[in-house]
Amino acid sequence: MKKILGIESSCDDTSVSIITEDREILSNIVISQNTEHADYKGVVPEIAARSHLANLEKAMKQALLESNTSLDEITAIAATSGPGLIGGVIVGSMFAKSLSSVLNKPFIAVNHLEGHALTARLTDNIPYPYLLLLASGGHCQFVAVLGLGKYKILGSTIDDAVGEAFDKVAKMLDLPFPGGPKIEKRAKLGDPYKYKFPKPIINSGDCNMSFSGLKTAVRTLIMSLQEINDTIINDIAASFQFTIGEILSSKILEAIKVYEQITNDFNRNIVIAGGVAANKYLQELLSNCTKIHGYQLIYPPTTLCTDNAAMIAYAGLERYNNGLFTPLNFCPKARWSLEEI
């Protein structure tokens, strides 16, 4: 049975996973760096890279032990090779290449975004094509997933990623890092209609998004307040999250229009992937929104929304099955669009 070892190190989570050709996740070890970055309330690239270097071997040993697998049983090694914080990407890629060379196993460079894009095929085995909303700390885009390595970006943020907006607003409210889950938790206790925030380019008639102005509006409000208490924090979090939901709901309908123009898709599946996909409020909102238009919204389990190596291993499996191996002289990339794969 084929077993793929996946490595993920593009940001602040060190992860190693082993999956089988039957899409069974035998192990998916994630070593978080939240404590290392907590004081900075954001990811420090140099600290992240050093932590990946210190944690990768430990994560691999745990993955092998948990899956009851030896290195000799590994069929191929897949690693995130971009986009991402280049220090961490290089650490993970070089680790994978070294294993590939020593074990004489194929190396497969995986685009981190492709890993997110294909997660629903790992978990739900959905067919191509489908519409994807990739929403994370570094990216926010609508993508037509037409096949393996065949992606068309329909629209994207013109400034900040939606996950970045969550984290920055959390920082403004002095909430712990990572901020996204903290905003969601506080929003449950607040009034989503308390503060009216702008929805930049919501009526632009395309699939592009903007979150910078929203972030600025939140900062302006906070600076205007004489005091900040828990009630105010909860109301700001709820109003901010509500506004994000309004923007994404509007734009996903625009994306459906464009998607239907370029594909004869009768599956009518929409996938939301990336860290923001773990937000339960947005899951329910977008699910109801798309259901009205005859689409099913699919989102991975929470553990597979955030960065993980299982999705990298699965992307590696699809590439292995199609004979798409990578030479060891492949250079990791800080920037790497899905359309450039």
UniProtKB/Swiss-Prot annotation:
Belongs to the KAE1 / TsaD family. Its cofactor is Fe(2+). It comes from Rickettsia bellii (strain OSU 85-389). This is tRNA N6-adenosine threonylcarbamoyltransferase. It catalyses: L-threonylcarbamoyladenylate + adenosine(37) in tRNA = N(6)-L-threonylcarbamoyladenosine(37) in tRNA + AMP + H(+). Substrate binds at L134, A135, S136, G137, G138, D167, G180, N279. Binds 1 Fe(2+) ion per subunit. One of its GO terms (cellular component) is cytoplasm. Its EC number is 2.3.1.234. Required for the formation of a threonylcarbamoyl group on adenosine at position 37 (t(6)A37) in tRNAs that read codons beginning with adenine. Is involved in the transfer of the threonylcarbamoyl moiety of threonylcarbamoyl-AMP (TC-AMP) to the N6 group of A37, together with TsaE and TsaB. TsaD likely plays a direct catalytic role in this reaction. It is found in: Cytoplasm. Fe cation binds at H112, H116, D307. The keyword Acyltransferase applies. CDD domains: ASKHA_NBD_TsaD_bac. Transmembrane segments: none annotated. PANTHER family: TRNA N6-ADENOSINE THREONYLCARBAMOYLTRANSFERASE, TRNA N6-ADENOSINE THREONYLCARBAMOYLTRANSFERASE, MITOCHONDRIAL.
